[in-house]
Structures are given as C-alpha cells and as structure tokens.
Amino acid sequence: MPSHPLTLVTVLGSATPPGRLRTAVAGATERAAAQDGVEARLIDLAEHRIAPADGRPPEQLGDDTGAVIDALAAADAVVLATPVYRGSMTGVLKNLLDHVPVEALEGTPVGIVAMGATDHHFLGAERHLRDVLAFFGALTAPVAVYLSSRDFADGRPSEAAAAQLDELAATLLGLAR
C-alpha cells in the first residue's frame, strides 16, 4: 500500500456550461476525497484553456495544457467523463488526450463515464475511449458507467447512478493500491 495518499483525478471533457454530468462526477469526486488516504480533484475542461493539439510541446503553449497533463501524469487513478457527441467522446477531451504523452497514463487505472440523452448511445464514447486508452497502455476499468436522462431527477443523480460512480472510483483506487 502506498505511503502517500492515493490521487484520483476526474477529467470532465465538456466545453459546455455545467450540467448534470458535472453534478454527477463532482459529487463522486467529493465523496472519493472524503475517504481516508485519498486526494481527489475534478478538472473541468470548460474551465481550462487547452490548445489545439498541433505537435508543439506543452511548455510552448502558454495555457493550461501542461498543468492538466501534469495532473494526469501524477494521478494514481483517473476518471474520464464525457457527454456523447456524434456517437463518441467530445472533441475537447480527444484534443486533451492528443497532447498527453503515452507514459503519462501507461499502467494507470482509468475509468470511463459517458452520458447521453438516451440509452441508444451507450457504447459510442466508451468504445472509442477504450481504443485510445489501449494505445496508452492504461489499465482500463472493466466496467464503465453510462448515464442518461433517466438517471437524474431535478438535476441530481439517482441513488443508483451515484452508487455506480462510487463503485467505479472504488475499483480504480483498489487497482491503484
């Protein structure tokens, strides 16, 4: 067991104003951070300026790209959360991942959370993210969380949805130990 606190970083890959997905993953991140021996933080890409991936190293970009990459590289476990856009992950999340060096996620436990308006999109983002995470050599959690409109009431996640998110975090932290 590591002598330092385990670090869980959740990346919310949405460029739109905060909504249900942010509420759900922020709550799960806060609950993970409340555990002994766990530090957790949410990186909302809507709040960070990430340059277009054009081959330049992060230190030449003059924005938030390098700091976000450093946070991912230092994490013991990562959650990637994305709304489903056009049957896949968002462009802002893919753009960030295009900046990340392979060694930053190699061997790191990574979980996938996707959200779509209906259940018809449940595999799109997950399938594409699994392909990208395989490229990195990440230790991808075997079960992803998919949320849709039915998982929320009054903008808040249902108990079942919150439990799925908490179980994903527990799985990732267990793998990181």
Residue positions per predicted region:
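N-terminal beta1-alpha1-beta2 submodule of the flavodoxin-like/Rossmannoid cofactor-binding fold
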Residues: 1-98, 163-174
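Alpha-helix N-cap/loop-to-helix initiation residues
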Residues: 17-18, 86, 118-121, 154
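Mobile beta-alpha loop/short-helix "lid" or hinge segments that flank ligand
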Residues: 41-52, 102, 134-153
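Residue-level signature of the cytosolic catalytic core of signaling kinases
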Residues: 61-64, 125, 157
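A glycine- and small-aliphatic-rich helix-loop capping segment at beta-alpha/alpha-beta transitions
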Residues: 95-102, 130-134
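A glycine-biased structural micro-motif
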Residues: 106-107
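Short, glycine-/small-residue-rich phosphate/pyrophosphate-handling segment
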Residues: 110-148, 160
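Hydrophobic secondary-structure block in the mid-to-C-terminal portion of proteins
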Residues: 147-177
